[in-house]
Swiss-Prot record:
Superkingdom field: Bacteria
Catalytic activities: 3-phenylpropanoate + NADH + O2 + H(+) = 3-(cis-5,6-dihydroxycyclohexa-1,3-dien-1-yl)propanoate + NAD(+); (E)-cinnamate + NADH + O2 + H(+) = (2E)-3-(cis-5,6-dihydroxycyclohexa-1,3-dien-1-yl)prop-2-enoate + NAD(+)
GO molecular function terms noted in the UniProt entry: 3-phenylpropionate dioxygenase activity
Similarity remark: Belongs to the bacterial ring-hydroxylating dioxygenase beta subunit family.
EC number per UniProt: 1.14.12.19
Listed name of the protein: 3-phenylpropionate/cinnamic acid dioxygenase subunit beta
Primary enzyme class: oxidoreductase
Known partners and oligomeric status: This dioxygenase system consists of four proteins: the two subunits of the hydroxylase component (HcaE and HcaF), a ferredoxin (HcaC) and a ferredoxin reductase (HcaD).
Keyword terms of this UniProt record: Aromatic hydrocarbons catabolism, Dioxygenase, NAD, Oxidoreductase
Designated gene of the protein: hcaF
Amino acid sequence: MSAQVSLELHHRISQFLFHEASLLDDWKFRDWLAQLDEEIRYTMRTTVNAQTRDRRKGIQPPTTWIFNDTKDQLERRIARLETGMAWAEEPPSRTRHLISNCQVNETDIPNVFAVRVNYLLYRAQKERDETFYVGTRFDKVRRLEDDNWRLLERDIVLDQAVITSHNLSVLF
């Protein structure tokens, strides 16, 4: 297991993630993109229910990618949202990203840290459409020379095996 970081470093990384979440909630997508490393991998797979006996044996059921995006692909998603023609976001969703249980560890790569957080993403749209996305995120963040941060990897793991929302146009 990798070493945990100092309280100060944990706080700084947590604050970076809180700021990033507020940019998404405020629809400041270009500012959010600026927080991403050029090499970002932004992924989410389907969640499959596995039998207890299979999990004990380490057998993982097959899954499918929901997201497997690069920065270019995320930029295209945001450009589409900015056109006002993305039907899934008309009217725009109101979101709230809640992040908790933040655990930060060092990695073998200098200035790159592994972060695990639990999250709840609340999404409201129109008058009555409400969706909750709950799960765990596995992020990697990079500290830059000027002491700024960039998101290098995000792997989103949903607790739900069935997604009941009309679409997945929100960003996690």
